[in-house]
Amino acid sequence: MGFELDRFKGAVDPDFKCNLCNKVLEDPLTTPCGHVFCAGCVLPWVVQQSSCPVKCQRISTKELNHVLPLKNLILKLDIKCDNHARGCEKIVKLQHLAEHAEMCDYSPAKCRNKGCSEVLNLKDMDAHMRESCDYRAVGICESGCGLMLTHKEQKLDNHCCLKALKAHNGALQGKVVTLDKELKKQALKSTKREKSLLAQLSAVHNELQMTALKYQKKFTEYSARIDSLSKSLSPSPPCKGGETKSVTAILHRESGSLGFNIVGGRPCVDNKDGTSNEGIFVSKIVEKGAADKEGGLQIHDRIMEVNGKDLSKATHDQAVEAFRMAKEPIMVQVLRRAPRPKPTGPTGEGQVVDISTQTDITFQHIMALSKLPTSSTPVDVLEQYLLPEGHSPAHEYFDPNDFLEGMQHEIEREELEYEEVDLYRTNIHDKLGFTVCYRTDDEDETGIYVSEIDPNSIAAKDGRIREGDRIIQINGIEIQNREEAVALLTSEEHPNVCLLLARPEIQLDEGWMDDDRNDYLDDLHMDMLEQQHHQAMQFTASMLQQKKHEEDGGTTDTATLLSHHHEKDSGVGRTDDSTRNDESSEQENLADDQTSASTTLGSRRRLAYSQDTLGSGDLPFSSESFISADYADAEFLGDFPADECERFRELLELKCQMQSAGSSGTPDQSLLWPSGGQGGVGEEGVDKELELLNEELRSIELECLSIVRAHRMQQLREQCREQSWMLHNSGFRNYNTSVDARRHELADISELPEKSDKDSSSAYNTGESCRSTPLTLELSPDNSLRRGNESQAEAGASSSTSGPSRILKPLLSPVQEACSPTRGRPTLLKESEVGTQPEVRERKGGRHAHPQSPYKHAHIPAHAQHYQSYMQLIQQKSVEYAQSQMSLVSMCRDPVTSADLGPKMEWKVKIRSDGTRYITKRPVRDKLLKERALRIREERSGMTTDDDAVSEMKMGRYWSKEERKQHAVRAKEQRQRREFMKQSRMDCQKELGVTTEDKKDVNIIELSHKKMMKKRNKKIFDNWMTIQELLTHGTKSPDGTRVYNSLLSVTTV
């Protein structure tokens, strides 16, 4: 319907009128025939009649169109207010009429008092409600009902409390009924929602069960493989493998190669006693080569003779030389073992056993073993477990590493699932609410991962982003480096962010096992706890007996207790000499000598404490833990004066007595109860006493640490500066020859072949021999974090012990245990030994290993644990934190020897050619040199040559690495130009006949001298030699037999 004509100011154009309502057009619509009508008039007409109102043609509503120019003209007309009849004299444009009507003072409004039905102007509403309305509240009834009285009731005095209460009750009941209906609606809606969620939960549960069954099947398969591997790798008598026979093969070189690789050999030429079991074995045979034929060689054959020359006790180099010098036809005599019969009985649980402990083989050990070179002793042939019974192998022998490598690839293969997440921000400055982690150096690029999620953020409310997810794309752009990721995440161009995330497909937590298995594990845990309790009681009895024996006059020989070091294996030493050829360098022999004498009591104390939480009874308690604290030597005390040590010991004893006085009467009674007449105390009393002592000593150790820290703080500040300078001066050593660089190596370090510029190979393709395999470090996820926790426990060691604490040392926390004098030196390990035996304290097996390592995966989600690269980033942070915590106390404990521990190292994340990531150690020296270069460059950036000439301190110009490279290139070009000019001059002299024999002799001598000097320089310098080391050690050769010419002169200004 249109607008009334009398509302407009002045006359209205007839073209603005509607032919149906004869009013001014409101939202005009035009028909295909050209007629214009109001929208409210023409739409009902066309719907009913399906034709134009003028009856000219048939039309439909879809053919009607808006006339915007006509509408704009009408909106500019002046019109009176809608409330003109109520007194409003305002005249506005039609387009502003709606805005005026909202705030017009003459708009009709109903009184808000209950019962009043008057309609007033908006401006008169407040005055009416306060003053003139008969239904306004004026007070409370004083007759007893307590309801509000209106002005009308007070004026007429006709208020009835009973009727008012009934009316009020009815209103409340009506409200209750309304709320009840709403409650039923909400309950029905909630029931439907609950059913839907239960259905989804059931589907997820079924999927979880299917996944758990699939995982169990894989676990069973891997367990079978592990059992067979354990059985194959365990030492067995030679008679089980079958009889050996001597075979002679005749070989001819094809294209200069014999077509096979060898490993092994006696470790040293001087070792001619014949006791070593080393020999030369065939490790690989090239397909269609000279050795790959009927009557040729086979893998694992032991080479005895080559053309009559005995190689049974030869070294690896002697065997290579013998094959090189052999003339065709080459007669090779080998020892070959007959194939083993396949076991028919049931296979037991495969375990690796050393002298003192029994440890389960895990996947980390298998991966480490697969990367070791082939053993030099005849390895038992692996059985092919997954083949059908009727299928026989093509050869009698095969390489175990082939199976291990395939298994490693299958384990390392990760099936990823991708998810696209859209995050919507209401404001462009809102934070997404998650933190990313990535590499901080510039050597290699790596992925971007989600490390933390804010609980109340946009990402947390979305719920699809998880910790450990890798970000592949942001807003459709693939991420190449961290700069791009930061730029896209912080960009303010787009309020919405679209992320493409990748995570491992298997995302099961540890709760996938069924209830029966959990019950079984709980029972097993209780059994182990009972076993631990029983051992603790025996331990306490032996302690009481020992104390009584000491009081009766008997003495305990400390040397007897210490003699057990060489009788028990520490769990990390080598079991045979099969890996001796991994790196044939002189430092290995030194490491062997040191390793045999470095099995300390500290490792056993750490093991005893780590078993305390779990209750495992793998290792019995030993009397080694009861060595008196008085046995501490000068090396453990460091530079503490004797009077200070004695005063600290008295203070500690006083602390023990004061702490124990509150709980058990007298100090002597609570701390020294083994020496009294309480030998017959019951088990419950002993347990309570032990618990009280443990709690007291834990609080004492914290106070002791604070006392030591306050006592040493002033000295530490001065020593830190000296130690840092000493470390920088003497810490740069050759990593190829230094034994100190391996001082802190751990048992989960494995060897991986990488590309090297200095690989050595024999003439007949011995490239796979152990000597040409450089070493690199790879950390397993299980051991790295646990090792960091042990480092933190060792770092908190106190520097002194007390009398009462040495009596109960095995039952204390790691801080007291670390106070033993035998913890002063870390154990030296050989890199070639690592991985041959698992560490006892690292491997518990099964789910019971989790309680003893609370920091292992504390804040890492389950699905992120399957992401190898993300886990290694987290491990890097954990290891760096543990090392930083350990550095302070280690310098306090042994400040003299801290500078001799070798070059400082840091953990770096590296990327292999196949894309996998690993963590390795790199010297901090590179980083320090880079920082030093930047600092010097900043200091000398604003200095000119004239300024340097005027100043007293001659700084000199600093040349960057790129500039030094350019200098080297220019120097090379100048040298080549000089040689060219010299050669041209010599040619010219030859043509003129001026050259003489004397000059030729001089040139030959000079060239020979230069060549000899180059060789000497190579012997003096290496890749890691610095000018400071050259000046410190002089210009002597490494063996100290020669003195070379000075190659360098340094003038200090």
UniProtKB/Swiss-Prot annotation:
Compartments where located: Synapse; Cytoplasm
Catalyzes what?
S-ubiquitinyl-[E2 ubiquitin-conjugating enzyme]-L-cysteine + [acceptor protein]-L-lysine = [E2 ubiquitin-conjugating enzyme]-L-cysteine + N(6)-ubiquitinyl-[acceptor protein]-L-lysine
Which range is the signal sequence, renumbered to this chain? none
Q: PROSITE patterns this protein is in?
A: PDZ, ZF_RING_1, ZF_RING_2
Which terms does the UniProt entry file under GO BP? neuromuscular junction development; protein ubiquitination
Q: Where is the PDZ domain?
A: 247-338, 420-505
Q: Where are the transmembrane segments?
A: none
* Zinc fingers classed as TRAF-type: ranges: 99-154
Q: What is its EC number?
A: 2.3.2.27
Q: What class of enzyme is it?
A: transferase
Which biological pathway? Protein modification; protein ubiquitination
- Respond yes or no to whether keyword Zinc-finger is given for this record: yes
Coiled coil residues, start to end:
683-709
Q: List, alphabetically, the CDD domains matched.
A: PDZ1-PDZRN4-like, PDZ2-PDZRN4-like, RING-HC_LNX3
Report the function annotation for this chain.
E3 ubiquitin-protein ligase.
**Known partners and oligomeric status:** Interacts (via PDZ domain 1) with kidins220b (via PDZ-binding motif).
Instruction: Output this protein's name.
Output: E3 ubiquitin-protein ligase PDZRN3-B
Report which gene this protein is encoded by. Answer: pdzrn3b
